[in-house]
Design a protein with these regions (language model features):
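Acidic, metal-coordinating helix/loop segments flanking the phosphotransfer/catalytic sites
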Residues: 13-32
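Short, conserved "switch-loop" micro-motifs in signal-transduction and mechanochemical regulators
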Residues: 68-69
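C-terminal output helix
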Residues: 90-99
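Two-component/phosphorelay signaling modules centered on CheY-like receiver
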Residues: 1-12
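Receiver (REC) domain active-site loop signature in two-component systems and cognate sites
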Residues: 39
Length: 104
């Protein structure tokens, strides 16, 4: 997602959710998090639950990316607090529009 957003937004890429949590615990507060569903060390739904159950981070909007077109999964993640669910591959312009709607 970073290659599509770099010109319009400051973007920090972190390799896995554990590094993201460490980065957040260092005091970094992003306007938005984009997270894949399938990641090393911790799945995206676990990361989402961790974030939404943490008082410091629960207000940060999270957009989930997935290559699986599963209505059940999409509804579950939205119910668990995801701001949006975007199917991969995605149109870069659509991603920018959705992000703009969330953070503006």
């Amino acid at each position: 997602a970073g290659i599509y957003l770099g010109k319009d937004y400051d973007f920090t890429y972190l390799e896995d959710p554990i590094k993201a949590i460490e980065w957040l615990n260092e005091g970094n507060v992003p306007d938005l998090i984009i997270s894949d569903i399938r990641m090393p060390l911790m799945m995206g739904d676990e990361f989402l639950r961790y974030m939404k159950n943490n008082e410091l981070f629960k207000s940060i909007p999270i957009v989930m990316l997935s290559s699986e077109e599963s209505t059940t999964e999409r509804i579950r993640l939205l119910e668990e607090g995801a701001e949006d669910y975007i199917l991969k591959p995605f149109n870069p312009l659509e991603l920018k529009i959705r992000i703009k709607k969330i953070i503006d």
